[in-house]
Amino acid sequence: MYHPVRGQTDRTPNILADGTKITIHKASEYNYVAVSRNLLKRWGGWLDFGDFIVLSGTDGKDGVYQVKDTMNKRFVNRIDILESPGVKPYKFTDAKIKKANLNEDIKFITN
């Protein structure tokens, strides 16, 4: 997980890599993620900005998230959830991630 603050982003923590502008103190409400560059189609991966992913196998963070941001090139095979400043850092190592099929996976979050 990461916070939209200068120490963890670039000089514009309220603007994500796809150009989306956020309200920093409401970051946890968006359900956005940043992915490592190797996972983005632009660099040969399988995800694109705007794609939805289903995250499962976490402790309280399972759900549907939208790809909106990317990470420094030093990170590989990683997805970070965007959280508001003040949210205590957490980490998952065995989470499962798949690209969402919106026709089926929307049922997952509404039931």
Model regions: which residues?
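Solvent-exposed, well-ordered loop and adjacent helix/strand elements within mature globular domains
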Residues: 1-111
